């Protein structure tokens, strides 16, 4: 729910700073649940990063479509990193919470490795059997084009450029410690490859 993340890595201890009604409503829901505890029940609030799996219909699917058409990624100079959540890892965690004695609380949920957008595009291309087309255009040029987009209301503007290039790295250390594990069962690249291959099987 925290669209703006102060610092390098988001942990459960960082006070959320949601931007917009979507994030704000999620925090309000968390506050309500935590303010009405049940004496005989455990309460878990999971904060997953972008969840993906076979049949995914979100932004990952859109990026896949762009890459499949051979459109170059022009923001290669921005080496950002973002965390994702494989549906297999999410199901593993939920099962663990159901069968183990885990303390109530808020838990971040994500795969162990953060990937750059360049890395994500490389994973998509590898699944497609294609060579990644990544352009490393100067950051100054892209920032300038985004400013022009602000004034002319073009698809690429400063806000969208920030969204496309910002970091969103999350710690899953708390949930792994609670479940008594050292790592998630599915690596980030493995899970993303499974998701991407599900797209190739349905197109």
Please provide the spans of the model-predicted regions.
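Conserved C-terminal active-site "lid" loop/helix of NAD(P)H-dependent oxidoreductases
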Residues: 87, 122, 145-182
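Catalytic helix-loop patch of NAD(P)-dependent Rossmann-fold dehydrogenases
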Residues: 6-52, 56, 72-75
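Residue-level signal for the nucleotide or nucleotide-sugar donor/cofactor binding architecture
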Residues: 20, 82-88, 115, 170, ...
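A short C-terminal helix-loop "cap" of Rossmann-like NAD(P)-dependent dehydrogenase/epimerase domains
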Residues: 15, 64-75, 130, 155, ...
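Mid/C-terminal beta-alpha module of Rossmann-like enzyme folds, strongest
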Residues: 100-156, 187-188, 192-196, 200-203
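A secondary-structure boundary/capping signal
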Residues: 47-48, 111, 171
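Substrate-positioning beta->alpha
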Residues: 28, 56-62, 76-98, 104-105, ...
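Short aromatic-enriched loop/helix-cap "lid" or pocket-rim segments at secondary-structure transitions
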Residues: 5-8, 56-60, 119-122, 146-149
